[in-house]
Regions:
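Positively charged, small/polar-rich N-terminal and surface patches that mediate targeting and assembly
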Residues: 2-162
Length: 162
């Protein structure tokens, strides 16, 4: 089994412009988070895959998740990812090509395969992925986070989800 020894050290820091058009602070991120879904999924599958893939991104590095939320009445809510997430779609071949490019560039990525729709727990999910060679994975989605220009090249050919 091939093990990817490339690593992409990505900075969780941001650069900021002090004032945007609305008078509010504008935050610009050095990295980009993208989910690419296969373009023939059912709506429930799109949501399910996106949720699972984003759990991989959110837990992949400390500092990606912001502070907890609190409303004016003092109710606390869980923290969320600090930066926006783009959701895109692509055909089977473009999705496989994006996976290969991400691996080649050392971009950490989460994968979701067709087989995971029929598994019932985390261990079974890992077993289903482990049973298939990388080039033969029946991908329905990937999620990645890395430097903007690298991620843009990796997902070239995908289009915004609409």
């Amino acid at each position: 089994m091939h093990e990817n020894t490339n690593t992409a050290e990505t900075d969780v820091s941001t650069s900021t412009d002090t004032v945007g058009a609305t008078g509010a602070e504008v935050v610009r991120f050095d990295t980009k988070v993208v989910v690419v879904l296969r373009d023939n999924l059912l709506p429930w599958q799109e949501l399910n895959v996106t949720a699972f893939l984003m759990s991989g991104i959110a837990t992949s590095q400390s500092g990606l998740v912001g502070e907890s939320y609190r409303d004016a009445d003092g109710n606390d809510y869980l923290p969320m990812l600090r930066q926006p997430v783009l959701v895109m779609t692509a055909g089977v071949e473009a999705l496989a090509k994006a996976r290969t490019k991400a691996l080649g560039r050392g971009i950490p990525m989460a994968v979701y395969t067709e087989e995971l729709f029929s598994t019932g727990h985390d261990a079974a999910n890992r077993e289903a992925v482990a049973a298939v060679a990388a080039e033969d994975l029946n991908l329905v989605g990937i999620a990645l986070r890395g430097p903007k220009n690298v991620v843009d090249r990796v997902v070239k050919g995908a289009r915004m989800h609409g």
